[in-house]
């Protein structure tokens, strides 16, 4: 899948005002090491403390009304799960998140607190992913 500049502009317009504007600063050490100007964006200042909510909100916002009513299923062991759960709840979209066995309790709990139904199952990411695909087919 290729991403074009127009895709980025469309995503920006779709999520603008619905996620935090976060600052960025020049990373002196990384700039010195690479010989290029490197900047770091502080996405940890988002509500879920991760840039992942940008992509989650972009995708959820693009769903049709019928798709929204059916809900979404995602697989993640952490930050993406929280981004999907948080924005799905804000948009009134039912969300089920499959998290692999061994996912830290804090990630599971935060995802539930954001309003998602959480299923903890599957050995590793591949096992949880297979389960999520199976659930999506139903």
Q: What feature does the model see in each segment?
A:
Residues 1-138:
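PLP-dependent amino-acid enzyme catalytic core
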């Amino acid at each position: 899948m290729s991403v074009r500049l127009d895709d980025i502009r469309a995503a920006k317009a779709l999520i603008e005002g619905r996620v935090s504007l976060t600052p960025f600063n020049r990373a002196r050490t990384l700039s010195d090491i690479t010989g290029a100007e490197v900047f770091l964006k502080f996405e940890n200042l988002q509500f879920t403390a991760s840039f992942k909510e940008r992509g989650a909100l972009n995708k959820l916002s693009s769903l049709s009304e019928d798709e929204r009513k059916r809900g979404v299923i995602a697989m993640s062991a952490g930050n993406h799960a929280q981004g999907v759960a948080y924005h799905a709840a804000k948009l009134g979209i039912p969300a089920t998140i499959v998290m692999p066995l061994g996912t830290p309790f804090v990630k599971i709990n935060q995802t539930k607190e954001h309003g998602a139904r959480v299923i903890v199952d599957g050995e590793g990411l591949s096992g949880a992913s297979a389960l999520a695909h199976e659930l999506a087919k139903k």
